[in-house]
């Protein structure tokens, strides 16, 4: 980004050359071959075609690790790995999910769950995703300046799609949106989630955000289908492949924070967080819960969070 800022001369022929080894599947160099590929002329070198390399050693590596292993891709073939050692969701996993074809009709028996990520401001955008079983789609993404206007838009989406449950990011900007939705009568279906709050399985995950993102990875392995067309297809791919993870001193999985991602030059994963929020807690489909009589007579309100 610093380099691009200096290449703004109008009447100067500008040549920008980026050399590197494809050792990581994230970062600005990776995006020269993916998101920004149309802006660059690519030259790729396979080690086996270089005159000075030890062909016998390279052949042995291919035999030991396999032609399609990440080790051979990086050290021999000169192409990007499917996943870095610390990448939670690999590009290959996302690619497979984008090739699956599902419709809402295929998952009609599953609960409908809405995930709402509220932007903190700046370049971040608010995003809304709807998941039903293995099917998912984006409903909304936009820069949000007024919390009340965004709350009214969410109320419209809740009325239109009638999810069994909706989970909203309760960060700095999310709390007033949540309060407004409750005031509008959606308190029975919406639940606020703090990314830093304790995980349901706090023996395995540092916080709820780490737990939700790991659930997304499992959902993809289990057959989840991602959009393959439209701007949301590239947005969700970029987001899901971006965060890295590690295990803390207590052996709990911890997802890379948004602040650390920004230090690596990566934007906030707004779409990824919205999708992850659809895994915030188990949800029971409205039609699967029989009406129950309360202690004071009449029927109890539907509670989707019966877990």
Give residue ranges: language-model regions:
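N-terminal accessory regions of nucleic-acid-interacting proteins
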Residues: 91-97
């Amino acid at each position: 980004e610093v380099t691009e800022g200096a290449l703004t001369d109008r009447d100067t022929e500008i040549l920008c050359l980026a050399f590197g080894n494809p050792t990581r599947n994230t970062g600005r160099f990776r995006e020269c071959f993916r998101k920004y590929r149309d802006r660059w002329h690519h030259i790729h070198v396979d080690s086996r075609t270089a005159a000075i390399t030890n062909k016998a050693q390279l052949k042995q590596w291919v035999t030991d690790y396999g032609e399609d292993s990440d080790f051979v891709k990086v050290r021999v073939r000169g192409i990007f790995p499917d996943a870095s050692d610390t990448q939670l969701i690999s590009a290959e996993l996302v690619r497979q999910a984008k090739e699956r074809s599902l419709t809402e009709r295929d998952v009609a028996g599953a609960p409908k769950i809405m995930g709402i990520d509220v932007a903190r401001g700046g370049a971040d955008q608010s995003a809304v995703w709807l998941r039903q079983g293995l099917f998912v789609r984006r409903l909304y993404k936009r820069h949000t300046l007024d919390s009340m206007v965004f709350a009214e838009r969410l109320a419209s989406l809740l009325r239109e799609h009638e999810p069994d449950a909706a989970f909203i990011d309760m960060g700095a900007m999310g709390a007033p949106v949540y309060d407004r939705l409750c005031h509008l009568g959606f308190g029975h279906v919406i639940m606020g989630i703090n990314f830093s709050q304790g995980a349901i399985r706090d023996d395995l995950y540092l916080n709820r955000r780490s737990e939700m993102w790991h659930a997304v990875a499992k959902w993809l392995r289990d057959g989840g289908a991602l959009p393959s067309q439209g701007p949301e297809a590239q947005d969700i791919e970029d987001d899901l492949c971006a965060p890295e993870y590690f295990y803390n001193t207590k052996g709990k999985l911890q997802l890379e924070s948004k602040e650390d991602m920004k230090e690596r030059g990566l934007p906030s994963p707004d779409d990824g967080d919205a999708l992850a929020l659809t895994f915030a807690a188990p949800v029971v489909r409205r039609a699967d819960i029989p009406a129950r009589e309360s202690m004071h007579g009449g029927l109890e309100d539907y509670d989707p969070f019966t877990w």
